[in-house]
Structures are given as structure tokens and as C-alpha cells.
Regions:
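Conserved SAM-binding loop
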Residues: 3-113, 165, 207-211
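S-adenosyl-L-methionine-dependent methyltransferase catalytic module, highlighting the catalytic core
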Residues: 82-92, 96, 100-210
Length: 211
């Protein structure tokens, strides 16, 4: 039986050894017969051909208890708290017993400590820098139809931020075990070496856990 490794929220990082999913509207347009080819040159991003459209919140088109490994990097922070918990529930469902889940999100503790340090040093725009760093603020309300469409379909803003303790607790509540901080390429399963990018671990919460 062939082992199955799934990455969701893959963006443009789609190693051939993994099954890669993304929920970008651009990808959905790109996958449309004829129209996708016509509009390809006008799209802001062109996804690799092996990226499939799939939404972890609605459920990925893979069987329950079927995945040996699961990976997501800088994806979960783009979800509301409710959707985040649904994503963890669905992640747990598709993993095999003993399967490994590795996830990475920006570390709000790091950003908060940076903010306090700047504030204590007298930086008068420390709060602005903090909100910019978290990607949670809105500098300007969307205007016109183009702005509305970009705001509605875009997914660049962060909706919920995490530190290690809070993310580990959520994983525990979702049923995961053997929860630990992880580092780049420190998994005992070598398949994760194909999908991980060292730069994504910088100033981030990185956790490995098992079903």
C-alpha cells in the first residue's frame, strides 16, 4: 500500500512527492477548462499543475484515516477561530492512527515582545508596527467593485494569531497527542524534508503531533 502525504494551503510550494491542496480563488479560475487558459496571463499567480483545489474547512477529497503525514505552513492564521477548529477536526479525521501532523504559524508572542521592547524604548509608532507585523489591521477600506472583490476573495490578512501554548492546547483538544515544538527537518519521517522550507520556521510556532 502506498503511503499518502497531504499538504494543504500549499501556495506555490508543491513537491511531487506530496498531494498538494490550496483554496485560492486564483487556482480555481486557473483550473477552469478553456477559460482558465485564456485568463492565465492576467492572473496574479500561476500555480504548479500538481496543485489541487481543496478546502480543509469543507473537507479535503481524501479518505478518513488515510494519511501518513499532514502538513500546513502559514495557513491556519488566515482562518477565523471557528474555522480553525474545524480545520483541526478535519485534519485529525484524515490522518491514520499514529500519523504525523506538522503545522507552522507566525508567533504572536515574538511579535508582542518586539512591540513591548519598541514601546519601552520610546518608539512612538510601535503600535502601528505591531499591527502591520501581525497583518491583522486594515489600512484602508476597500473602495469600488475591484476593491470589494479583492477584499472578499483575498486571503492575505491574518484572522487569528497563536503562540505555542495556545496552539498546543487547541491541538490537544482536537485529539492530537505527542505534541512538541519542532524544528526544520527534525521529523523522524523523511518525507517532511520534501515539503518544508527553513525560512518558514523563523519567528514562528512550529509543532509536530500525532493522531
Amino acid at each position: 500500500m502506498t503511503n499518502k502525504y497531504v499538504q494543504y494551503g500549499c501556495g506555490l510550494s508543491a513537491p511531487k512527492e506530496w498531494i498538494n491542496f490550496d483554496v485560492s480563488p486564483t487556482l480555481r479560475i486557473q483550473k477552469l477548462p478553456i477559460l482558465g487558459a485564456v485568463l492565465k496571463s492576467s492572473l496574479s499567480t500561476s500555480f504548479p499543475k500538481n496543485v489541487q483545489y481543496g478546502d480543509i474547512i469543507k473537507g479535503l477529497p481524501v479518505g478518513d484515516n488515510s494519511c501518513d503525514g499532514l502538513y500546513c505552513s502559514h495557513t491556519l492564521e488566515h482562518l477565523s477561530l471557528e474555522d480553525f477548529r474545524i480545520a483541526l477536526e478535519n485534519s485529525f479525521k484524515i490522518l491514520k492512527k499514529g500519523g504525523i501532523f506538522r503545522c507552522i504559524v507566525p508567533d504572536i508572542e515574538h511579535l508582542a515582545r518586539k512591540y513591548i521592547s519598541q514601546l519601552d524604548s520610546g518608539n512612538s509608532v510601535a503600535s502601528i508596527s505591531f499591527i502591520e507585523d501581525t497583518l491583522m489591521g486594515i489600512k484602508q477600506r476597500p473602495k469600488g467593485l475591484k476593491g470589494f472583490i479583492k477584499s472578499y476573495y483575498g486571503n492575505s490578512h491574518h484572522l487569528w494569531m497563536w503562540d505555542h501554548k495556545s496552539l498546543a492546547e487547541e491541538l490537544k483538544n482536537a485529539g492530537f497527542t505527542q505534541i512538541r515544538k519542532c524544528r526544520y527537518n527534525d521529523s523522524e519521517d523523511d518525507m517532511f524534508k520534501y515539503v518544508e522550507d527553513e525560512s518558514r520556521f523563523k519567528n514562528a510556532v512550529a509543532i509536530e503531533c500525532r493522531k
